[in-house]
UniProtKB/Swiss-Prot annotation:
Signal peptide: none annotated. Catalyzes the transfer of a ribosyl phosphate group from 5-phosphoribose 1-diphosphate to orotate, leading to the formation of orotidine monophosphate (OMP). It comes from the Archaea. It catalyses: orotidine 5'-phosphate + diphosphate = orotate + 5-phospho-alpha-D-ribose 1-diphosphate. Its cofactor is Mg(2+). This is Orotate phosphoribosyltransferase. Its EC number is 2.4.2.10. It comes from Natronomonas pharaonis (strain ATCC 35678 / DSM 2160 / CIP 103997 / JCM 8858 / NBRC 14720 / NCIMB 2260 / Gabara). Gene3D superfamilies: 3.40.50.2020. Keywords: Glycosyltransferase, Magnesium, Pyrimidine biosynthesis, Transferase.
Length: 173
């Protein structure tokens, strides 16, 4: 069932835009969900953190840098849980870490993400966490664009959950 309150908040914040947009995977779309709008709007961020908190259980939280960092931080505050940040690649300076924050080998981790289109950034984050010893089988996103992410993640034994889908956001528009 769609989270109508969150859908309304995303629409009211004007996070859903219409026009011609190039997406990060190279495709184009007639609509765009602007994560920076909903991640910087306190009302949207609060609703997202509350919704994530209802779903994460006791798992350690992980967010994909950069887009999911505000989401995982807000959810960590809501759940009083520590979290880790997964970079797209290892740093070439300082500690050289790809994963910032601590977790124990075998610990259950759930990845929080902003928007899923193909799911590749979530897959990359899960693979990095698994290589580091975490147990990861779930990714929760704010918006599933319904363009193959669920199927792509399933090929890697990862379940995709979404707070809302593109169909939810675009209904009645």
């Amino acid at each position: 069932m769609a989270n109508q309150e969150l859908i309304d908040a995303l629409r009211d914040a004007e996070a859903v835009k219409f026009g011609e947009f190039e997406l990060s995977h190279g495709g184009t779309s007639e609509y765009y969900v602007d994560k920076y709008v909903f991640e910087t709007d306190p009302g949207c961020l609060r609703q997202i953190a509350d919704a994530f908190a209802d779903r994460v259980g006791d798992a350690k939280l992980a967010g994909v840098a950069l887009g999911a960092v505000p989401l995982v931080a807000a959810t960590a505050v809501e759940t009083d849980s520590p979290y880790v940040i997964v970079r797209k690649q290892k740093k070439e300076y300082g500690t050289g870490n790809q994963i910032e924050g601590d977790f124990d080998a075998g610990e259950e981790v759930v990845v929080l993400e902003d928007i899923a289109t193909t799911g590749q950034s979530a897959i990359d984050a899960v693979e990095a966490l698994r290589e580091a010893g975490a147990t990861v089988d779930r990714v929760i996103v704010v918006v599933d664009r319904e363009e193959g992410a669920r199927e792509n993640l399933a090929e890697h034994d990862i379940e995709l959950e979404s707070l809302v889908t593109a169909s939810d956001l675009l209904a009645d528009r």
